[in-house]
Amino acid sequence: MTRRTMEKPFGCFLLLFCFTISIFFYSAAALTDEEASFLTRRQLLALSENGDLPDDIEYEVDLDLKFANNRLKRAYIALQAWKKAFYSDPFNTAANWVGPDVCSYKGVFCAPALDDPSVLVVAGIDLNHADIAGYLPPELGLLTDVALFHVNSNRFCGVIPKSLSKLTLMYEFDVSNNRFVGPFPTVALSWPSLKFLDIRYNDFEGKLPPEIFDKDLDAIFLNNNRFESTIPETIGKSTASVVTFAHNKFSGCIPKTIGQMKNLNEIVFIGNNLSGCLPNEIGSLNNVTVFDASSNGFVGSLPSTLSGLANVEQMDFSYNKFTGFVTDNICKLPKLSNFTFSYNFFNGEAQSCVPGSSQEKQFDDTSNCLQNRPNQKSAKECLPVVSRPVDCSKDKCAGGGGGGSNPSPKPTPTPKAPEPKKEINPPNLEEPSKPKPEESPKPQQPSPKPETPSHEPSNPKEPKPESPKQESPKTEQPKPKPESPKQESPKQEAPKPEQPKPKPESPKQESSKQEPPKPEESPKPEPPKPEESPKPQPPKQETPKPEESPKPQPPKQETPKPEESPKPQPPKQETPKPEESPKPQPPKQEQPPKTEAPKMGSPPLESPVPNDPYDASPIKKRRPQPPSPSTEETKTTSPQSPPVHSPPPPPPVHSPPPPVFSPPPPMHSPPPPVYSPPPPVHSPPPPPVHSPPPPVHSPPPPVHSPPPPVHSPPPPVHSPPPPVHSPPPPVQSPPPPPVFSPPPPAPIYSPPPPPVHSPPPPVHSPPPPPVHSPPPPVHSPPPPVHSPPPPVHSPPPPVHSPPPPSPIYSPPPPVFSPPPKPVTPLPPATSPMANAPTPSSSESGEISTPVQAPTPDSEDIEAPSDSNHSPVFKSSPAPSPDSEPEVEAPVPSSEPEVEAPKQSEATPSSSPPSSNPSPDVTAPPSEDNDDGDNFILPPNIGHQYASPPPPMFPGY
């Protein structure tokens, strides 16, 4: 009996022991996030003296072992310290790292010293694919004779210690496919002999130091990290033959200095937030064999100088927003074997570019706007973009006088530069916060088809990056409205712009690709950001170049999101062209994104957004995929290929852009179309990223309404867009109030808008809005035509704030009620959109309210989305086209008009209740009535953003 009882406990113990052993081995094979964090803490504790080593460290270590020379002793100290930093070594790579014979250690290579051939030293370390988990201790700085350091495809984490700067003979440094974090490893800048730098597939972040291109490097692999900045202009000094920027968060333009890279053979930009037109200097890259700029936010036409790429074998421009004609000069390049230009907006191609036209060359023209070709975008998606192509001769990126990396500037210089704008600015300021709510408009982004892409474009456009995503919350956007003046003239054209929105869509098409488009936006936003604050002032002067003005605008509004606001600002300018004001709205969206975005990037392309390991903590697993990249030989290509898709993630950031389209809704006639946008649904995804931002601005609710408030007084008139819904003839009752007080009321509206999308909506609502906004754009243009004239005087009518409230939903009626009002400012308000107002407009300043401008508002968003077209959008604030002519008339009443824009904004949201806000707008007018059109206008402008819903203003 005793023996049996003894066996039982023993058996249990044996089982427990086996279980423990199995767990141990399992844990050794995987590195959890907690373990990675633990390793990082251990490294930080080991990094004394700021990660550097004391000069006398070898004397501090007492060794009884004998070494052939002091350099091998130092190597022994370094390698033993490193072995202790190994947390997991599944292949027992360091099992024989014992004893003084360091040259026999696995992965360690010795050679005669360069300065003394009689001395044997450790010259190289190669632990590629060893799957070791650990960190780099500062003692590695003792390996001063190492020229080759390869540790790719492991699980090393933490930072690159500063002590490695002592490895002055470093020739090849490969730490790819690990889990390193922190800024760019600047120790690489201190190695005079470095030729090969491979840090891809890690989690390095921040800006890329310009000095990296001053070094005599042959290969630079930066792909699949978290770098976010513009590409330094110093790139032209680089002697590298291979450079990969893929799957990061780079934004802005491709520097024109790229044409000076005479040794360049391969360059890859896949999956970033780059935007604008391609610089003509690319044609000077005579030795390039691979050029990949896919999944970004590039716009305009392909430069004719590409015919100078005599040695190019592969070119990929897919998932962007290129337009125009693909010529024979490119497709007949002598060594070209693969040319992909799918998922863009090309509307023509030479016969030699048609897939299947050549047995030796492969072409892909899928998802463009080509007639008589299969698998192309719908006319609805193409019209907005193709009808307003980006003029690269005026684009900053292509060397023109345009504004900023965003192509948007180029769009419409037409601009009226309405003087009213000025006044508007002030109003905007106050309302700004409200406008933020506009974000909800973002949903509208849906710009019909593009929906996903669409939003991404928008964002990028304005903000250039990042902010867009965040959240439009930054009420700021409204602020920009004032700026709109600049844009204004363009706005008139706006009608067309609206269409562009779809453009983003194209990316969407891709579904997975969608992301790419986004990126584009982000980039755009970035550049603008800086300018934004200044921009606001210029607005007026910018008139001509509306495109840029938008950017500036943002600054005004809210420190945080200013960039986005810029867009809005153009609208302001237009005053008469209220539509422009809408523009600002889009920015809003973008702004928030910006934070993200950049990351998020070109949406469509890579739905893969996840793509980059960015998401999770660097430590997470994402790194594994590239394991082998390390190998130098492949390094060049392999990394890139994977990156291709990963980049997409960043694009999401831009979802905001979609809002851009909302402006179109103002059209009124389009109202029905408004809903067609449903597709935009996709945009929502991106929004999530920013959704948080919206919370920030409790205003969210105001999201849409805010915009309206700004302009509401005057806007009411324009609510035209909303008019669709505006049935709120009630607004008309306000007519009596015509007084211009409207401006003050503007704030009132902010509340209504919120209801529409309220912050949350931004996150998800974006999708819904998209649905409507797109269609409207198409029609919106026409309506605007009339509203502008009336706007001039209409502002006063808006005064009656009371009406606005009720109008919130009545929107439908408003559309036509305006006609009656022509005579009186108020009546027009509703129909503002309707032509009736136009007639009266001339006489009644109120109509002048260019309620339509609001439409543009939503468009604003679009501008970003456009990214490549962004310019177009800007100018195009949906209604503007028609209004353009009228604009002038409105100018007189200009101030009122400012308000109108606000309303328009509501329109964007139109699909949602948002239209209601527009009514609110009306109320404000009553207050300011006597004051003077001038003051009124400014206030309205501010809100232009949010008003999406307001369409209903009867006054107009």
UniProtKB/Swiss-Prot annotation:
Carbohydrate attachment residues: 273, 287, 338
Disulfide pattern: none
Pro residues composition bias: residue spans: 408-417, 640-830, 947-956
Stretch forming the signal peptide: 1-30
Tissue and organ distribution: Expressed in flowers, stamen, pollen, and pollinated carpels.
Residue ranges with Polar residues bias: 355-377, 837-852
This protein's name: Pollen-specific leucine-rich repeat extensin-like protein 1
